[in-house]
Amino acid sequence: MNTKTLPLVIEPDVLDKSLGYENLLIVDLSRPETYLKMHVPGAVHLDYSQIIAVSRPAMGLVPEDATLTRVFSALGVDEHTHVVAYDDEGGGRAARLLWTLEVAGHKHYSLLNGGLHAWVNEGHPLETTAATPTAKTFQLRRNNAPLADSAYISDRLGRDDCRLLDARSPDEYNGLKKYAERAGHIPGAVNLEWTQAIDTGRNMRLKTDEELNALLSPLGITADKEVIVYCQTHHRSAHTYLMLRQLGFENVKGYAGSWSDWGNNPDLPVE
């Protein structure tokens, strides 16, 4: 196996055997103090704030192309690089990096299944010395296919061939917790909190395909539909995006800004 054949969701033992491969870049989005304490050998650290933009009240937006080009070049990404991302929180930050790479036109990436939890708990090697990225030239080719905004979603409300999946907590979905001017959810959206896809009994891995489909199918989330995922800032829902991609869903989009955008716009409908 080489980097061209690495799967979308990679197991720790497979990554362990792949350490040192040419064109492999491992990116750690854990907290800085965690990274300095322990990380996958050779992994470079990336602060999550580098891959999101803010235009208050909207948070979690996609940065300008020039910003992404600068960040990914400094990180050491070029057209040949296969990025494996992980974090220490269950995969949300890592998944957001991979979704952002997709938006930037980069196709070669994997999510470490279980992240740092699985890597450490299953006895794989660790390093404490910070790795210095080797800068490369990243050629951004903007790809809007994985991206939805409020106008795009508004045009699809009520359509049978499109489903909205809210990855926030049930309390946020039902309007009992409010982190924007308005509470509730986008009309027609169904709710599956992002953590429901995580198997805490298997070191924070994704649940099996069968288990995930059993959660999704009753909600009307099936692979023949377009699915748009969102949360508060497209952090949690980035994990949901990767989960759906792993299941073979081909038409999936993430709403950058998510409820911090929709919930603060008085012109948009709310349930």
Annotate each language-model stretch with its function:
Residues 253-271:
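Cysteine-dependent PTP/DSP-like catalytic domain, specifically the C-terminal lobe
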Residues 43, 89, 233:
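Residue-level signal for short, function-critical loop segments
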Residues 45-46, 82-85, 163-164, 228-229, ...:
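Structural recognition of the beta-strand scaffold that forms the well-ordered cores
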Residues 228-229, 247, 267:
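C-terminal soluble interaction/assembly domains
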Residues 2-79, 149, 154-224, 264, ...:
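Positively charged, proline/Ser/Thr-rich regional signature most characteristic
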Residues 228-236, 261:
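Small/polar glycine-rich anion-binding or flexible loop at a beta-alpha turn
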Residues 103, 123, 198, 263-266:
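Short, isolated positions within intrinsically disordered regulatory regions of eukaryotic proteins
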Residues 4, 56-156, 176-177, 184, ...:
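Thiolate-centered catalytic microenvironments shared by cysteine-dependent enzyme domains
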